[in-house]
């Protein structure tokens, strides 16, 4: 079964909730990542020299890019059944040493952040839609 119109709509609508408070949700996202994988801090240029996760334009921009890429993945999965990226997105992850366990940590942080942003709109169906979209993105990044 392919990615459904309803799944795409769930990802799109909840990504808009993230955009309502990107500073707060960006800090939450990276805080969760670093709680699970403290060594990942060195992979993010905007975090590696900081004492902790502090809101900054670069942090916010990167978080918005990540969430936007997952949203775009949902659109691609619905339209074509696969996610296709330009080579840059995959190569930077290889260059930074991103491994499978890192993708798991980011997925968990992404889901927890969207759950927080969604509030009472959160559901297992919403979670599953984000999981499938993220998994499609992760697969494309690893293949790039």
Swiss-Prot record:
One of the GO BP terms on file: nodulation
Superkingdom in the source lineage: Eukaryota
Modified-residue entries (Nitrated tyrosine), positions: 25, 30, 134
PTM comment: Nitrated in effective nodules and particularly in hypoxic conditions; this mechanism may play a protective role in the symbiosis by buffering toxic peroxynitrite NO(2)(-). Nitration level decrease during nodule senescence.
Chief localisation class: cytoplasm
Location of the protein in the cell: Cytoplasm, Cytosol; Nucleus
List of residues binding O2: 62
PROSITE patterns: GLOBIN, PLANT_GLOBIN
Keyword annotations: Cytoplasm, Heme, Iron, Metal-binding, Nitration, Nitrogen fixation, Nodulation, Nucleus, Oxygen transport, Phosphoprotein, Transport
Segments passing through the bilayer: none
Tissue note: Root nodules.
Positions that bind heme b: 45, 65, 93, 96
Gene Ontology terms for molecular function: heme binding; metal ion binding; oxygen binding; oxygen carrier activity
Pfam annotation, one family: Globin
Residues modified as Phosphoserine: 45
Matching InterPro entries: Globin (IPR000971), Globin-like_sf (IPR009050), Globin/Proto (IPR012292), Leghaemoglobin-like (IPR001032), Leghaemoglobin_Fe_BS (IPR019824)
Start and end residues of each Globin domain: 2-144
Annotated coiled-coil segments of the chain: none
GO cellular component, one term: cytosol
Gene3D superfamilies: Globins
Oligomeric and partner information: Monomer.
Family indicated by similarity: Belongs to the plant globin family.
Function noted in UniProt: Leghemoglobin that reversibly binds oxygen O(2) through a pentacoordinated heme iron. In root nodules, facilitates the diffusion of oxygen to the bacteroids while preventing the bacterial nitrogenase from being inactivated by buffering dioxygen, nitric oxide and carbon monoxide, and promoting the formation of reactive oxygen species (ROS, e.g. H(2)O(2)). This role is essential for symbiotic nitrogen fixation (SNF).
Annotated protein name in UniProt: Leghemoglobin-1
């Amino acid at each position: 079964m392919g990615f459904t119109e309803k799944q795409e709509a769930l990802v799109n609508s909840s990504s808009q909730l993230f955009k309502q408070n990107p500073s707060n949700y960006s800090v939450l996202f990276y805080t969760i990542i670093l709680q699970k994988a403290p060594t990942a801090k060195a992979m993010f240029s905007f975090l590696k020299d900081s004492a902790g996760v502090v809101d900054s334009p670069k942090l916010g921009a990167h978080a918005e890019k990540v969430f936007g890429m997952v949203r775009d993945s949902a659109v691609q999965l619905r339209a074509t059944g696969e996610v296709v990226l330009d080579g840059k997105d995959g190569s930077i992850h290889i260059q930074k040493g991103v491994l499978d366990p890192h993708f798991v940590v980011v997925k968990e942080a992404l889901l927890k952040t969207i759950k927080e942003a969604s509030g009472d709109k959160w559901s297992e169906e919403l979670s599953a839609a984000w999981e499938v979209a993220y998994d499609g993105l992760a697969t494309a990044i690893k293949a790039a």
